[in-house]
């Protein structure tokens, strides 16, 4: 018997437990709700960590380059700020926000100095401040100072939060919304900001979560289990994945927006992205001869014709990506086996294989 069971006030007193008055059907219903909440937390933390790893690796690849004649000033500003490291903000730090912070620290190359938290009661986050994470209550300050801001507040708090930070979010900042009840279009109106990544989660009745949801009490413990990593993959076929492939489209376009800031030629940006996603993986082989991305994978033919070889990609409105089909949507539909390779990259990333980029000594780390 676990020690925490003996400490429970209802130990060996089933009539006093919360579920005692519930019928069998009601107990099944509450168990399903708990399972979905756990699955949402695990998926949300895993996908956020994968996104930060990819963005960090891409930034480091570009910042390590030294031959962009139009990007010296932008590069100087980025390197001057936090030595070029990706700055992460978490707005709202309840149970989910705290699990997200721990996941980012353990599953990415981010250090505590890279993460800031704004919450109404920062004094309750001593476990985070002891790690060196800045915790305060100033939503406007947080929004104005980070590269990626994770929204982890309650839906009921979103309007008040939006009114506080509206107009303070830099164009280059990506708002990663984990407020699942609010669509991206509405969030864009609230924030007057278009760089929004919002994963849309769905959990079907016939899925493996019921067998896995008690695997670990925290996302970090759960994501040590390979089966859990497998089912959180966003690159599974429709009906099995907990998040649609549209999320990865938003991720890819948001990563490419960073190359716009440095005025990196579009061909070179795609080349660096291919290096990260299709490069050597510590000798582990994925699918043979995967189809690589090209500039045409991300923009239409008329846009390609307007770009010179030295031109960067245009700035992508991420909220529009979530609402309509893009050239990347078509590219994925034409090359379905590509998802197998991306699923491999995702699994290796979660297993902490150096499949994306070794960032030691890069970007100030």
Task: Provide a role label for each language-model segment.
Residues 100, 128, 161-165, 187-188:
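Hydrophobic packing residues within well-ordered alpha-helices of enzyme cores
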Residues 177-258, 262:
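Rossmann-fold dinucleotide-binding core
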Residues 2-130, 136-137, 141, 257, ...:
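NAD(P)+-binding Rossmann beta1-loop-alpha1 motif at the extreme N-terminus of oxidoreductases
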Residues 109-110, 165-171, 189-192:
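Short, conserved loop/helix-junction motifs that constitute active-site signature segments
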């Amino acid at each position: 018997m676990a020690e925490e069971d003996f400490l429970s006030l209802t130990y060996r007193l089933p009539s006093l437990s919360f579920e005692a008055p519930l019928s069998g059907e009601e107990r099944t219903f509450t168990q399903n709700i708990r399972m979905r909440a756990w699955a949402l937390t695990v998926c949300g933390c895993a996908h956020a960590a994968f996104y930060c790893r990819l963005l960090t690796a891409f930034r480091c690849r570009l910042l390590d380059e030294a031959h962009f004649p139009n990007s010296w000033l932008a590069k100087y500003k980025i390197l001057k700020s936090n030595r070029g490291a990706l700055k992460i903000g978490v707005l709202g730090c309840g149970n989910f926000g705290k699990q997200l912070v721990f996941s980012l620290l353990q599953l990415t190359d981010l250090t505590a100095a890279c993460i800031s938290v704004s919450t109404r009661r920062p004094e309750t986050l001593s476990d985070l401040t002891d790690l060196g994470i800045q915790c305060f209550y100033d939503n406007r300050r947080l929004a104005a100072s980070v590269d990626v801001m994770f929204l982890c507040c309650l839906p009921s708090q979103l309007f008040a939060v939006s009114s506080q930070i509206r107009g303070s979010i830099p164009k280059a900042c990506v708002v990663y919304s984990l407020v699942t009840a609010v669509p991206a279009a509405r969030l864009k109106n609230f924030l007057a900001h278009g760089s929004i990544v919002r994963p849309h989660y769905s959990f079907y009745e016939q899925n493996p979560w019921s067998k896995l949801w008690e695997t670990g009490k925290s996302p970090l413990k759960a994501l040590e289990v390979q089966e859990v990593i497998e089912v959180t993959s966003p690159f599974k076929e429709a009906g099995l994945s907990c998040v649609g492939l549209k999320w990865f489209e938003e991720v890819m376009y948001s990563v490419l927006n960073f190359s716009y800031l440095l005025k990196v030629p579009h061909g070179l940006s795609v080349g660096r992205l291919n290096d990260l996603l299709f490069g050597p993986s510590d000798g582990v082989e994925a699918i043979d001869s995967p189809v690589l991305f090209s500039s045409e994978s991300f923009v239409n033919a008329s846009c390609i014709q307007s770009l010179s070889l030295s031109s960067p990609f245009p700035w992508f409105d991420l909220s529009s990506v979530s609402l309509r089909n893009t050239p990347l949507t078509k590219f994925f539909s034409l090359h379905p086996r590509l998802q197998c390779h991306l699923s491999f990259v995702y699994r290796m990333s979660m297993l902490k294989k150096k499949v994306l980029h070794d960032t030691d000594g890069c970007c100030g780390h």
